[in-house]
Amino acid sequence: MIVTTTDVIQGAVIDSYLGIVTAEIVYGSNFLRDFLAGIRDVIGGRTGSYERLFEQGQRKAIEELELRAQRLGANAVIGIEIDTGTINVDQSGVLLLITATGTAVRVR
């Protein structure tokens, strides 16, 4: 399976566009726990634990895109975009949301 952020694949011809595929990954977060754990990780304004969480979520979202594209008969996903955000649930925590979107295609 070819996955790319570009709208074309060099050297390949798109035979058919099979549709938009999306994947959503949601992680629960406990503000107090994450805040205390994050104190150890913060170096130069960066929080390693959250960076690893988002990196893992992006990988999982792309894997899910591939699975959904395969179900449509695709052998590639083009134009992939990944967005991240948070959803405030209540005062005790937030949900971390990672969304991936692309176009499932069959190429030769």
UniProtKB/Swiss-Prot annotation:
<dbReference type="InterPro" id="IPR002765">
    <property type="entry name" value="UPF0145_YbjQ-like"/>
</dbReference>
<protein>
    <recommendedName>
        <fullName>UPF0145 protein alr2488</fullName>
    </recommendedName>
</protein>
<dbReference type="InterPro" id="IPR035439">
    <property type="entry name" value="UPF0145_dom_sf"/>
</dbReference>
<comment type="similarity">
    <text>Belongs to the UPF0145 family.</text>
</comment>
<dbReference type="Pfam" id="PF01906">
    <property type="entry name" value="YbjQ_1"/>
</dbReference>
